[in-house]
A protein has these predicted regions:
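Aromatic-rich, lipid-facing transmembrane alpha helices and their immediate juxtamembrane interface loops
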Residues: 1-302
Length: 302
């Protein structure tokens, strides 16, 4: 088992390194018209990173999470392109390789990656992962707490789209039927992004709450890696593309809404690394909550 985990860690590091180098080099515009056949192959590196990290993070529950994320993204895209639901109006993709003739497979896989990155970053920020912090945080019940975590997941995904969507609309990757106020993108689109990510992670978090699993994880670089991937995918890739396209305003707004979460996650990671009680942590929030409740009882009896 230790060798298997070590091998997965190596795959995570390799995929993240390739992703970062390829994005920085500007060779991975996966949807843009000027992409090359070589660049297309790198478009799936982020997905591979997510799969490897999920296997390390969630183990046997990784397929459940990834399946929920894929289903949520696919359903929303099919409803959006066909009926204009979820995102406020109809839109269509200009790529030729579409699933059901409506949505490129790369878009569906990107949904999986974005939702997982949002989920993982929230877990890094989550004070419940620092068992002592739960003492004052979790007082309203675990279900409400999960609701708050999923809300943060939704914002993380939505903020990424605030730089992603304008770039692809400008490049002709997809077209909104009636345009929109935000660089040609309707505001309702971002509300849709929020709720799709929220729904996917909420389902999994509630499932985990009802069927707890005890999976401890060290707070090491692998634990922090989703933050690096999120920053690389969003800020580096789309920030550079925005600049190349002559629309730095996309990057300014996108980075402005993404960076605070990246900074908070980085700070949280550093704090947890320096706290002996938080290494390793349990990914089972119910176990964390029970431990904190026991700690509170002990404190009250002192």
């Amino acid at each position: 088992m230790a060798k298997a985990i070590s091998a997965v860690n190596v795959l995570i590091i390799v995929s993240l390194t390739v992703l970062a180098l390829s994005e920085i080099a500007g060779i991975v515009p996966t949807y843009l018209p000027h992409q090359t056949a070589f660049a297309k192959q790198f478009g799936y590196i982020l997905v591979l990173f997510v799969v490897f990290h999920a296997l390390r993070n969630l183990k046997f529950r990784a397929p459940i999470f990834l399946g929920i994320a894929f289903a949520a993204g696919a359903l929303s895209e099919l409803l959006g392109t066909t009926y204009g639901w979820i995102y406020g109006q109809r839109y269509y993709y200009t790529a030729s390789d579409k699933v059901f003739g409506l949505v490129p497979l790369s878009v569906l896989l990107t949904w999986v990656a974005v939702i997982y990155l949002a989920y993982s970053i929230t877990n890094i920020i989550d004070p419940a992962k620092n068992l002592l912090a739960l003492k004052k945080v979790v007082r309203v019940g675990s279900f409400i707490y999960v609701l708050l975590l999923s809300t943060l997941d939704g914002f993380l995904a939505m903020n990424l789209d605030m730089i992603l969507d304008p770039v692809y609309v400008r490049s002709g990757g997809w077209v909104w039927q009636d345009g929109g106020a935000y660089f040609g993108v309707p505001i309702s689109n971002f509300i849709g992004w929020f709720f799709v990510a929220f729904a996917a992670t909420f389902i999994f978090r509630v499932y985990s709450l009802r069927k707890p699993f005890d999976t401890a994880q060290k707070i090491d670089f692998i634990f922090f890696a989703p933050v690096v991937a999120y920053a690389t995918f969003g800020i580096v890739k789309y920030g550079v593309l925005s600049y190349v396209m002559g629309h730095t305003e996309y990057a300014v707004i996108g980075i402005s809404v993404m960076f605070p979460f990246i900074a908070i996650a980085t700070l949280s990671y550093q704090l947890k690394r320096s706290t002996p009680e938080s290494t390793p942590i349990s990914l089972d929030i119910t176990k964390d909550i029970n431990l904190t409740q026991k700690q509170r009882v002990l404190d009250e009896n002192r």
